[in-house]
Amino acid sequence: MAHIKLDTLDVVQRPGTTRRSNSNSGRSSACSSGSLSPVPIIPIIAISRDTDDSESESEIETEPARLFQRRMSIKCTNNLAAIIKEGFLLKHTWSFQRWRRRYFRLKRNVLFHAKDFQCDVLDEIDLSDLCYFECGIKNVNHSSQIITPTRSLVLCAESRREMEDWLGSLKTATTPQRPRGDSFLIEQHDILSNHHHWYATSHARPTYCNVCRDALSGVTSHGLSCEVCKCKVHKRCAAKSIANCKWTTLASVGKDIIEQADGSIIMPHQWMEGNLPVSSVCAVCKKTCGSVLRLQDWRCLWCRATVHVACRPQMAVACPIGPAKLSVVPPTSVHSISTDDAWDVASPKGNFSPLLVFVNSKSGDNQGVKFLRRFKQLLNPAQVFDLISTGPSLGLRLFRHFEMFRILVCSGDGSVGWVLSEIDRFNMHKQCQVAVMPLGTGNDLARVLGWGSSCDDDTHLPQILERYESASTKMLDRWSIMVFEKAIAVPKTPKMSITTEQEALLTGMVTSANHHLRFIVETNDTQTLISSTQSLCDTIDDLVGRISEHHREDEQLAVKCDILRQKLNMLLDALQEEEMGAHSGDDLIATIRSLIARSIPQTPGTSAPLLNPSISIEKNEKDEINTKERRSSRSLRSSEKEALQSRANSVKRAIYNVVEHSEPGRPKRYQRKLSITPFEALKLPTTASGDSTPCSSPLPIIPPINIISPTMETSRLTCISPLPDTRRDSVDESFFNSISLPAPRQFADSRRSSGVPDVIQEIEEGANGETVYRIGRMSLSGGANIDDAGNRLSPCSDGGENTPTERKVDFLRVPILTGEPIVDPLSDYRPIEVFERTYYMNRELDRGKEGTEEKKGDIEKEKSSGTDVEKEDNMPTEKQALVHICNLQVPGIVVTPNSQNVYTSASLTIIDTDAQTTNEQSSSEEIAGEASDVLSAISNEECSVASEIFDKQDAGHTLGDIIQSLDASNFTHIDSPETSDETEAMPGESIMDDISSVLGHDITYALQDNTLTDDTTTLCSEHVGPPKPPRKKSLSALTRGHSHPRRRNSSPPRIPRLARMDSDDNPQQFGFENIVFEIDNRCDDQKMREPPRYCSLAQFVEGNDIARQSFKQLMLEQHGSNDNDTEYPEQQTPTNTMTNLMATTSEDELSTQTAIKIEIQDVDATMVRNINSSMKANTILTTSTSPTKKSGHGQDISVVVRPPTPLRGDSVKPSGSLLLDGSGGAISMAMGCSSLLGVRAMNAEIRRHSSHAPGLAVREIDKDKDRRHSGFNPNLLTLDPEHARFLSSSPAASRRISCGSLFKKNQKIATKRGYGLFSVRFLVVAEPDIRLATLALIRPLIPLPNEALPNLQTLKGSKSSLFMGSTLFGFDQFAAGDKEKDEKGCKDKEKTPTEETGRKLPIINPLVRLPNWPNLANGGGFISKCLLANADTLCAAVSPLMDPDETLLAGYHEKCVMNNYFGIGIDAKISLDFHNKREEHPEKCRSRARNYMWYGVLGSKQLLQKTCKNLEQRVQLECDGQRIPLPELQGIVILNIPSFMGGTNFWGSSTKKDDIFLPPSFDDRVLEVVAVFGSVQMAASRLINLQHHRIAQCQSVQINILGDEEIPIQVDGEAWLQPPGMIRILHKNRVQMLCRNRSLELSLKSWQEKQRQHSISIQRDTSSTTSEHATSTDEVISERECYVLLNFIEAVSSLVKWVKFLIISHPALQHDLYAVACRASEALESIHPQGKLLEGPSLRTKLVEVIDSSRQLYDDACTLLRDRGHSLILREDLETKLSAALANMEMELKKCSVQKCIDGKLRAYFNVLAPNEEPDARRKSRPFWVRLRSGSTAGQQAFKPPLTNTREAANNWSVNEVVTWLETMQLSEYVDSFLKNDIRGKELITLGRRDLKDLGVVKVGHVKRILQAIKDLSEN
C-alpha cells in the first residue's frame, strides 16, 4: 500500500542541481525525476508507490525528508572519482520496519545505492553536509544512521568491524584531501580533531538540544548524544554542531590556553552548557543548579564540577581534572606528534601515571561499547582505543615517548595476548605495565591477577580506576610457541573408529590379501602354497569386483584394476616357473594354470595401451631373473626368492593403488616413493605388538599390508629432536624403531636421524680379494638394483667368490628388518633398525632351535650364517638365506660364526673368557667375529653415514683403522675443535662428540666397548711412542695364541700400510677411550705452540637438519708429543676389593634382574693411581681371593644401584676409578671429583666373566678439564623387559651442557650405608633420572630382614635416607653426622621455597613412569611408596638443553606467544568447536552465560565422540629434554598460570607440606604440564582438587606431532588445527603486569575515611553553638560518645552475664575465666556507681580499665571456646546467646580506643561513626570458634548473630547522626534537605521511595543506595 507523505508540501529544488530522466527506469516522473515534464507537478501530496524508496529513521519522526531523489547511470561514470568503498548493506525501509539488502558504492562526497551491483541506474546521495552516528547502545545489530539535508538512511552491517569500516570510509569521503593519506594520519586526525561522535539514544528526563536549545522530540527525548562529551542534539541539528568535543591535545585547546608567568601552561576547565545531572550542586555557592525546564548552567568535562552561570566567574581557573587525575593525560601535556608518529609529551607537575586503555568492543556480553564510551568520558579520548577498529599499534606508537605508563586491556585473554605481542614488536617491555579488565568469557589471566572473573557494570568505573592506580606489579612469563611444520611419516596401525560394514569388508579383504602374499613367499608346504594362491586370486577378484561396482564410470580406476590383474598374472607366472622344475605334471601346475586363465583381464585390448610402458620392461627384467635357475625344491635360493618377492611387491602396490583411488576422501598415506626391502623383511615377528591403539579418526583407515616394509607398526620417533627419548614403551621391548626427519643424507648430525640414502654402495669382492665399490641406485619396483652403467647388481656378493671360512661385510651393513606384517609400504624415508638388545638373545635362540646341528658344528651351516644378523624365530631356512643389506661405504669387517663361550638368557648375555676353545680359529675367523657387537650396537638413530665422509678408504681397512683414522680424518664435523682456529674452546667438547655426531652415539658407544683393551689407561698420540715393555696378555690372547692382546670383538690387526698401528707400542690401537682424551693429554709446550681450538655450532638450512657447511676438510699439521702425562689427584677410597657376584641364567633369577649390581665386599685392595708413562708402567695389578668363596656373615655386601638414565652419561664426566682385579673382576667405585659417572645402561648387556683378566684401572680425569666421555660400563646388570617398560630410555641425540648447566663441580655422587645381618652396603650412584622403583626388587636378590630396608614412607628426602638427599647433586659431606644434617635442615627453612626444597628442574611426577599410571590404588605398592618417598631424588635435575639459539631453532618459526596456557587435544578441540560456532552463529554467543553453556554442550559432545582418544600415540612429550611416557589420554595442557578455561585450577592446590612440586606461579619461569584424560575430568576439576594428572614442572617443552593428521591446539583460548611437526615452548620474555593489591586498597580506604571524618568533625565543630562547643572538649564525653558508651556498657554486661552462666553450668571448665568476668563486672560498676555515670575527666580514665578487662574477657572466652569447643556440649539457647554477646562485644571494642595524653594519663575515646558500612562476610555465618566445632547441631545451622543493636540505635539517632550517616555514604548533597525536614532516626528507617523523591533524591542510583542502607539498618 502506498504511503502518503504530508511533509513535502514545500518542495525546494536545490540550485545548480540538474535532474535527469531515464525512460528505461520504468518509474513515474513524480518520484524518479526532477526534470520538467508536460504535466505540471502539483506539490500537494506525493504518493510513493515504491515503498523501498522512502527511508525512515530508527524512530518515526516528523523531520522533513526531500521528495526528489537524484539518480545516475553508471554508464556515464567512467571519468568520475575513484570508488572508495563498495559492498552490500541492509537498508531500513518503511514497510513493517523491514530490512532490505542493497548494494552501496561510495565515492568522494557521493553515496550511490541500488538493488544489485548489476543495476545500470543508482540512487545518488550528496554527502556535503553529512551527519552519521550509531543507532544502538549495545553491540547488537551494528546499525548506523546517515543524515544529510535531503536524505536519512539507516544501514546495518554484518559486524561492528564492517560498520566502523563504512563509517570510517564516509569520514574519509567527506574530509578534505591531505598530503599524506595513509591510515595512520586518518586515525590520527580522528583523534586530534574535536568532532563529536554521535549515537542515537533516549533520555529519561527532559533534555535540550545544545545547538537549537529546544527540547528533544518525543516523550523519551529521543535524539543524538556524543559518546565523549554527552552533547545532546537533534538529528537535524547534528550537522550544524560545532567541533567543541573534549580536548585531546594542546592544539585542540585553542584560545582557552592559560599560560603562567613562568611559561607553564595551566589546564583550564572545559565547560558544557545545560543538561546537568540530577541534584547537581554548584561548586561555588553549594546550591542546586541545573534545570529541567531550559538549557542553563555549566559543567566541566574534566573535573565534572557544576556551576551556576552567575558563579562561573568566581570558579578557580585551573581544573583539578577530577578523581582520575593520576591516570589522565592532560591535553596541555600533549604538544604535538613527532616524526616517529609518537606524542611529544611534557609531563605535568605532581604524580603522573598515564593510562592507555584498549577496549574490545565485542567483549563482555557486548558491553564493550559502553565501556569504550565511559572511558572516553573519564579520560582523555586520545587515551582510549577500540581494538576492533584500530588495534593496539596506534596507541602504543602514540605513547612511545612516555617514560612509564600503564596499559589497561578491557577484553578477554586473546586480546591481552594481542596487546602483549604488539608490545614485543615495539620493544616497550620496560616502560609499560599491563592490567586486565575482565570483559571476556574465561578471563583466566584477570582471575590470577586478582581483577575478578567479570566486570559488567560501568557505573563504578571511577572506583575501578582507583583500584588500578593502587595495584602492585608482578612479572608474567611469556613463552614462544615455536613450530616446525614438517610431515613426519609414521606407520599407522588400524585405527579404532566407527566404520561402515562396507569399509570393514574392504579392510578385511586387503588384510587377507596381505597374509596370502606372505604365505606364498614364505611357505615350504606345497599344499599351503596352492591354497594361499587360490585364496589370493579369489580375494583380489572379489576386491576388484566390489570396487568396480561402485565406480563404474571411473576410467582411471579401471586401468588400475587391469594393472592389478596384470601384476597378479605375473606372480602366478613366477609360481608356475618355480614349480615346473620339481613338480612337473603336478596338481599344482594345473591349479596355477587354471588360476592364470581365470585372472586374464576382461578388456585386454583397451587397457593394455593405457599401461605404463615401464611395466613391460620391468616384466622382461624380472622374467630374465626368474628364468636363470630352476628350483629343485620349494626351499628357494636368495635370487629366486628375490624375484618372487618382487612379484609380491608389485601385487601389493597395485592393491594399494586401487584402494587409494577408490577412496578419494582418505588421507593419502601411501603415496610416497618405495624403498627396496630385502627378503629378510618377509619374516614374521617373534612377538606380537603391544595392546596400544592409535587415535581414532572419523575416516576408516585401511591397514597397511606391506609384507616387505622394514618399519614396524609401533615405530616411534626417537631422533627427531636433540632431546632424549624416554617414551613409554607400549609394545614389546625388543623393538626400538625410529622414523627420521628428512635431512641431507650426506651430512646427518647425531642430533637428528636420517633415513636410508637414495644412493647406496654395494661392496663386491672379486676373486683377487679386492673390495670393489659399486654405486647403485634402488629400483622402485622392488626388483634388482641397477648401477650407473645400467647393469643389474646382485643383491649380495657372489657366493662363489667368497672363501668358505669368511665373508666380508661392511660394519655398517645393516639388514632391514620388519616387526609386523601391517606396515606402511610407502614411507618416504626408511630407517634401518638393528636391535642391540635382542641380537644376542635371538641368535642364541636360533641356535637352540637347531641344537643338534649346532652341536655337530656343521661347517656348511657356519658358512651360510656368515652374516651374523638378528633373525626371527619362524623362518626355517634363515641360516641359508643370503641377506640383502643396504651397504654404507665403509671398509668391510669380517663376521664369524657364533662363539661357543656365550651364554644367553632373556635379557643377559655372559661371555665366559675362561672357556677353553679346542679348535683355534684362524686370524680371519677371529676377525670375522668382530662385527657382531658393532652390528648390534648400531642405533636406530644414525645409520645413514654418508659415503662422502669415509670416501676412498683402501680395501682391507678394518673397523679399528676407521676408528683410529677418524681422529685425524680430513673430514670433521663443524662442532669439532679442529674445524676452526678462531673459535674458542668450549668446555665439554671432545673428539668423541665429533665422532658421535657422525656415527651416532649408540654406534660410538659400541665402538668404545669393542676397542677397549686392558691398556685403556694409556694416553695416545698421533705418533708412535717409545718402546714399552711387553704387556701382560689378556685371556683371549693367551688362549688363541695371538700376540695382539684384545677383548672379544676388539679391532683386528692392521694391514701393512698401517703397520705402525699394528705394533704393541702404538697406544692408539688400544681403543676409542684413548682417543677421547688425546687433545688434553698433550704436553704443555705442544699446547702452547698450537692456538686453542674451539667448537663452532653446526649450520642448518630450512627444511633440513644440518647443512653441508657443518663439515670441513682439514689438513692437520702433525706434531710430536711428549711422553709426560698430566698427573691426576688421587681419591681416598675404602681399600676393599669387591668380588663380582655373577647372576645365573636360570628363569627364577632372571625374573628378578634389575638395574642393581650386587657386590660382596670380601678383602682389602688398594686403589691404584695411574703412573706417568715415562715410568713405563700402565697398570698395577691387584689380586684377591677366589671369587667362588661363599659369602658369610662376616662379609660386606654392596649393592650398586645403577639405574638407566635418558642422558646415557654422554654429557657428564667420569666420577671415579674402576678397578678390576686379576682374579675375578672385583669392582670398586671411588667418589668422583667432578660430576656423575655417565652410565649408559644398555637394553642387553654383555657380561664378561674371567678369572684371569688383568687389572684394569681407569684413571681419574683432571678437575680442570671439562671433557665428556661415554661412561658405558658393560659390567652392569640391566632391566628385564617387564620393568624396562617404564624404567628404560633410549637417547635420541647428543646432549650438550650449556653455560647454564645444572651440573656442578666438586660434588659427591655416591654413598654407602649398611643394613641387616649381611652388612649390605647400598652404593647409590646418583643419576639424573634415577629409577628408584628398582629398589623394590632388592629383596628377591638378597635375603634381607624387614628392618634392613629403611621405612621408605617416612623418608622426606633427608640425606640420611637410602637415596641420599632431597636433591640429586646435594650429596654434601656424607661422612657428617646427623647433627650437622639437622642443622643444615634448619637453615634450609630460612630459604626461599625453591632453595628450601633444593629441587632442580625438571620435576617429573615419579608415578608417570609406572605402567598403570594414573590408575593407581590408594594404598599403593612398595614401588609407589619408594617413588613418592624419594621423589626429590627421582625428580632431580638433568642436564639442560644447550642454550636456545638459531642453530637449535633452525627451521622453526614463532607461531604465537603463550601467556596463560597451551592445550593440545580435547580442550583445544572444544575451544575450536566453540570458535567455529561463534563465527557461524554470532547471535548465539553474545553473552557470557550462553558461552559457558556452549562449552558445556561441546564438552558433553566430546564425552560421547572422543575424537582425541589415544592422543599419546599421536604425540610425544619432552620436558627439559626428558621424554615423558604418556598414558592413555585425550589431551595435554601446559600451564603458565594457575587458571585454565574459565577459572579452573587444573594443576590443583598443594595441601601437603612434603609436596614434591614447587607451588605454581606465573613469574617463576616454570611450566606445569598436566594430562587430560577426558571431559569428565575437566568438569570435575572445577569442583575437586585433582592432582593425580600432574606430569611435570619444567622450563621448556617439546611436543612432536606424528603422522599426517592435523591436531587441534589452543593457546590462551585461541584454537586452530596444527599440521604434523614439532612444537617447542621456550621462554620468550617477561612483562610487567598489574595485580590487585587489596591490602593497599584497605589502607587507602581507611586513611581516606579518617580524613573524611576529620573534615566532618571540623565542619561540625565550626557550625555548632557556643554552649555545645564549650562542652565538647576532650575531657567531657559528648552526646554522640555517650550514646556509644551506653551500647558498650550493654555489651559488656551481657558478656559478663553469659560467661558466668557458662562457668556455672560447666564446672569442669577453668575457673580463671570466672575471675576475669568478675573483674570486668567490678570495673563496669565503677563507672556508674549507684546507677549514675561519672562526669568529667574521671570517666575517660575509668573507662580505660573497663575496656582492658572487657577485652581480656572477650579474648579468654574465645580462646576457651576454640580449644574446648569440639568436646563441649552447650545448650542451644546458651550457645546462641553467648555467640551474640561475643559478636556484640567485638563490634563495641572496635569503637573504643585508648590514647595517652600529654599529662601521661590514659584516656578512652569512642568512634561515633558506624564502623561497618559493609558487614564482613564472615559475620554472616557463624563465629569463628563455632565454625571450628564439628558434629554440633548448632554449629551446623546457619547461625547469624546480630552485629549490634543497630535498629534500636538508629531509632534514637538525632538529625546530626542522620547527617553523618549520609556523609559516610558520600551523599552530602542531600544534607540540607534532611536538615530542613528534620529527618531523625525513626523517620529514616521508615523512609520509602516516594519520601526520598519528596526530599529531592531523584537520581535512581542514589535512591537505591539509600534504600539499601536503610534495609541493612533494619535487618541488623
Curated annotation (Swiss-Prot):
GO CC list: cytoplasm; plasma membrane
Native organism taxonomy: Eukaryota, Metazoa, Ecdysozoa, Arthropoda, Hexapoda
Similarity comment: family membership: Belongs to the eukaryotic diacylglycerol kinase family.
UniProt EC number: 2.7.1.107
Annotated function: Phosphorylates diacylglycerol (DAG) to generate phosphatidic acid (PA).
Disulfide bonds: none
Protein name: Diacylglycerol kinase eta
A GO molecular-function descriptor: ATP binding
Domain of life of the organism encoding this protein: Eukaryota
